C-alpha cells in the first residue's frame, strides 16, 4: 500500500458551490486540518499543485479552468507537509510549463522522508513542519488566512 484515499482532494474544487459568503468549503482550513487528523493512519492521496489560485472572494468552481482557494505557495508547501510517497500533480501540463519555478520545486522535493518534526501548529489554523531526507531538512508551513 503506497497511499490511502479518504481525502477530499483538489478535484472537488472543479464543482465547488458558492453561497452568499463565498465558497461553501474553506479549502485552506481543510488543508491545515488534514495533517493533524487524516495523516494519523498513514500516507494520503491529495493531489496538490494547483497553478490557478484565488482568494475566497474570487474563487468559483469551474470544470474548464479549475482553480484553488489560496496561493501557489500554499500549494507548494503541501508537497512537503503531506505524507504522500507517490505524489501526483493536479493541473494541466501547460500550466506547469508556464510556472517553471513551481515545477522545479515539485521535481526536487522528496516524497519519502527519514524524520518528521511538527514545529508548531493548531488544527484548522496553521502548521509548520520540518522533514529530513538524506541528511537535508525541508521546512514548510501553511495557514488558513487567505
Residue spans of the language-model regions?
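Carbohydrate-binding surface patches
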Residues: 123-146
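Catalytic cores of secreted or luminal carbohydrate-active enzymes
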Residues: 73, 77-119
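Flexible loop/turn segments at secondary-structure boundaries
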Residues: 53-55, 88-90, 97-99, 137, ...
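Aromatic- and carboxylate-enriched substrate-binding clefts and catalytic-loop regions
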Residues: 1-65
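Solvent-exposed, flexible loop/coil residues
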Residues: 6, 48-50, 55-56, 92, ...
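Active-site proximal loops enriched in glycine and acidic residues that flank catalytic Cys/His/Asp
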Residues: 1, 48, 92-93, 141-143
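Charge-patterned, long linear interaction tracts outside catalytic cores
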Residues: 46-91
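Residues embedded in well-ordered secondary-structure elements
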Residues: 35, 70, 119, 128-130
Amino acid at each position: 500500500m503506497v497511499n490511502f484515499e479518504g481525502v477530499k482532494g483538489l478535484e472537488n474544487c472543479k464543482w465547488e458551490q458558492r453561497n452568499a459568503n463565498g465558497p461553501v468549503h474553506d479549502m485552506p482550513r481543510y488543508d491545515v486540518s488534514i495533517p493533524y487528523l487524516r495523516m494519523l493512519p498513514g500516507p494520503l492521496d491529495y493531489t496538490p499543485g494547483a497553478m490557478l489560485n484565488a482568494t475566497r472572494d474570487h474563487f468559483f468552481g469551474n470544470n474548464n479552468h479549475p482553480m484553488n482557494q489560496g496561493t501557489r505557495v500554499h500549494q507548494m508547501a503541501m508537497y512537503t507537509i503531506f505524507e504522500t510517497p507517490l505524489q501526483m500533480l493536479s493541473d494541466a501540463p501547460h500550466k506547469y510549463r508556464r510556472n517553471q519555478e513551481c515545477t522545479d520545486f515539485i521535481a526536487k522535493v522528496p516524497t519519502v522522508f527519514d524524520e518528521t518534526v511538527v514545529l508548531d501548529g493548531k488544527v484548522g489554523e496553521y502548521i509548520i513542519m520540518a522533514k529530513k531526507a538524506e541528511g537535508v531538512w525541508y521546512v514548510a508551513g501553511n495557514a488558513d488566512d487567505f
